[in-house]
């Protein structure tokens, strides 16, 4: 049975960043359910916008995005729609439009060969015994059993590691549903849509590489019905759909209290969305995935006396920032306050008409 310093479950942005930064300094194994190349297998349903905080992480790491990761077009504003109030406003935003699956594969490709990576793999079981973490996973057609001193859950909203560590922990969840359509709009755009009759979260649209992506986060019970109802409503705001080319869905976490942020215990750690590190106001998680990976890298390499306590303390600033997003979300999803903000015209950039 092979033993490692660190076992990382999941190679989204958080897991890939951590594996890259620990390479050559610790003996690392990393498991991921995505394939190494191509579009076969699992791909993360995601709008694919890189926020300024995520961009800053790449600046710190000296990384530049390859052209095949960047999508077309690049848009500098978000059309914000309040359906009930029939209000539309344009707010400046500095997102980079990316192909999310290509981005994830590129992040994995940066992991040095010294890290033992298993693509298209499935983690079957984890447990702690004799001060070690045991991991059973399936890859290359057969089951393998390894041990590790440290276990890292970078496995997203449905984190197996989080469920093992905190079996009674409950966090609010939504089903994120997206459909892709051939682009019909004469001028591509991003949008953020609020309709409290549909969801107490929000919906979105993105123009990307000749497609129009429409999606949102909805209650788990009847999300598909609510999604369809909202699509019908959006014709009043000049949204054009046609026949769906592709439909996709996944679970998304929605932190709503301080206790929703969980960092791990017993030499197991959670990073990215697995820890609840996702913005409640925008559902953006890449920047917090990268930041939490960098924080954990620092803790693991410094080897303080109590690693879990050190990681909890080191993420305090990040958790406070995310708690601020919870407060912001409550403001944005409060109909009266949102209507007042949008009607005030603050930060709105009117579009010139011919």
From Swiss-Prot:
Any one GO molecular-function label of the UniProt entry: FAD binding
Domain of life, per lineage: Bacteria
InterPro entries registered for this protein in UniProt: FAD-bd, FAD/NAD-bd_sf, Geranylgeranyl_reductase
Pfam hit, one: FAD_binding_3
SUPFAM superfamilies in alphabetical order: FAD/NAD(P)-binding domain
Gene3D superfamilies: FAD/NAD(P)-binding domain
Family: Belongs to the CbrA family.
Matching PANTHER family: CONDITIONED MEDIUM FACTOR RECEPTOR 1, GERANYLGERANYL DIPHOSPHATE REDUCTASE
Protein's name in the database: Protein CbrA
Organism of this sequence: Shigella sonnei (strain Ss046)
Gene that specifies this protein: cbrA
């Amino acid at each position: 049975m092979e033993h490692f310093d660190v076992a990382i479950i999941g190679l989204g942005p958080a897991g890939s960043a951590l594996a890259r930064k620990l390479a050559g300094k610790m003996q690392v194994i990393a498991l991921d359910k995505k394939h190494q190349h191509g579009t076969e297998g699992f791909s993360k349903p995601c709008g694919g916008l890189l926020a300024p905080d995520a961009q800053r992480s790449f600046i710190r790491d000296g990384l530049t995005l390859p052209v095949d990761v960047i999508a077309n077009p690049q848009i500098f504003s978000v059309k914000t729609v309040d359906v009930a109030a029939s209000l539309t406003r344009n707010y400046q935003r500095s997102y980079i439009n990316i192909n999310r699956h290509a981005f994830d594969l590129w992040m994995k490709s940066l992991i040095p060969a010294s890290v033992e990576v298993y693509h298209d793999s499935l983690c079957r079981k984890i447990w702690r015994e004799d001060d070690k973490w045991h991991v059973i996973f399936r890859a290359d057609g057969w089951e393998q059993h390894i041990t590790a001193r440290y276990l890292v859950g970078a496995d997203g909203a449905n984190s197996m590691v989080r469920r093992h560590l905190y079996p009674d922990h409950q966090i609010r969840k939504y089903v994120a549903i997206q459909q892709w359509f051939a682009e019909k709009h004469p001028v591509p755009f991003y949008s953020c849509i609020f309709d409290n009759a549909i969801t107490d979260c929000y919906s979105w649209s993105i123009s990307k590489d000749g497609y129009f992506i429409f999606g949102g986060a909805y209650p788990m019970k009847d999300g598909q019905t609510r999604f369809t109802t909202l699509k019908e409503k959006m014709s009043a705001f000049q949204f054009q759909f046609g026949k769906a080319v592709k439909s996709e869905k996944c679970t998304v976490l929605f932190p709503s209290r301080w206790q929703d942020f969980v960092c791990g215990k017993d030499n197991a750690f959670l990073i990215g969305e697995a820890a609840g590190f996702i913005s409640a106001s925008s559902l953006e998680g890449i920047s917090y995935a990268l930041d939490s990976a960098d924080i954990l890298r620092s803790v693991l390499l410094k080897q303080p006396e109590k690693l879990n306590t050190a990681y909890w303390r080191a993420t305090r600033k990040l958790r406070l920032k995310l708690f601020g997003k919870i407060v912001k979300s409550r403001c944005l999803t409060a109909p009266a306050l949102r209507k007042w903000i949008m009607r005030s015209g603050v930060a709105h950039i009117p579009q010139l008409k011919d």
